[in-house]
């Protein structure tokens, strides 16, 4: 009897221990879900003062997009979610009216208003009144774009003397300028408009189709897509030159995201990558791959031997291993993990975010400094902060359960510690990877409107044309103006002088031409 009772007791103790273990697992899972829910709510409904910064929001968008891309597209519209509760906020005072001097670069059309002969007669004596001055007022007007048919007439010439003698009249036809699309009817301005609308303004081609139809001209989205591919073929030598220049950078920042590609019966999660060059090689170059394997960045970064600034994606290990590449980490990623887990360990989160805030404050102070001055400032101020943070990370790691959400933030930071500290030994390395993440956010916006690419050629086209429009944005260049001139000239441009069409060099040359003519440079962006 006693033996049976002891066996039952041991069995109950074992069951209690199993239940306790299960309760701990559920507790940690509950904390994780609370973190995710708080993250989504803050992203969606957070008050303006508490919402994520632009760079943090970009990272959240990328994380969400990769999860959402795997979900099926619903056949019916999803009912809108219930509106959040509103709270009183300080009303922002509207900015004053912009001075007309800000619009001096616009062309001027003058409308003159005069009195008729009858109105000029003086009502008192009937004598004609003389003009004594004017009153002026200004308006900013929008003149909708329009299509024109451009007729190219090539005159033919023949030798009348040879023709009279019965010989070959030696006919010569005047040369016509090369076109971006051989035997195509789309002019360079129209092609530039389509590329700018899709890759700089994120308009899907079906919307452009509707816009063109309202203006009295039908261009199907299929035709536009073919034209975009043709433009990419024309500018690919320039794209390759920009990629070559990026690989010459001292620091290359990179990031990637999903770019769905149509496949048989489903969409395939292909990838688009961005590689941001430094100030000496100021180009944002995109690349398209069929998957997220390391072969993509490894191929693009061939011959690169400097510093690669990236997130913690393990595929980059294969890029730097065996190569003379230094890998740098992103402190914005680390900070975001502490912010996400704030609800589960608020004291730790506040302490970590406070220290990281001081770290970023040093960067703000060093923003306009030279590379040498920035490095000295980091050595004086950032290194002690990092030493203090590391001590606290090790202490928190001992305090937290391994699966605690805050432990994930602590372990992530410690595992990336060497990469996260590279910026303290090189003043040219940024503290975060926000510059490439901002470019990925724009890819996400374009993907939201266009959903997918049709095939590998479409992905390659997207990468090439996004490279041009993104680099134009970086240099505050009007992509419509730049692309129009590029497509007019590049087909017949000598390959040895290709650098003249790099966006930064084109901008300087364009400004110099305008100055030589004594006219203001056209607006950039």
Placement of each model-derived feature along the sequence:
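Short, amphipathic alpha-helical "recognition" segments used to contact nucleic acids or chromatin
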Residues: 187-201
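Mobile genetic element proteins and their domesticated derivatives, centered on retroelements
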Residues: 46, 122, 159, 194, ...
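Short helix/loop capping segments that flank catalytic or ligand/cofactor-binding pockets
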Residues: 131-133, 167-171, 261-263, 283-286, ...
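Short, flexible loop/hinge motifs at secondary-structure junctions
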Residues: 1-185, 253-254, 498-502, 516-525
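Acidic/histidine-rich catalytic cores and adjacent linkers
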Residues: 303-305, 313-315, 351-525
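Flexible loop/turn segments at secondary-structure boundaries
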Residues: 129-131, 139, 202-203, 232-234, ...
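Gly/Pro-rich turn-and-neighbor structural signature
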Residues: 103-104, 114-119, 123, 205-303, ...
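Conserved beta-strand -> loop -> alpha-helix junction used to position metal-binding or nucleic-acid-contacting
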Residues: 251, 312, 321-354
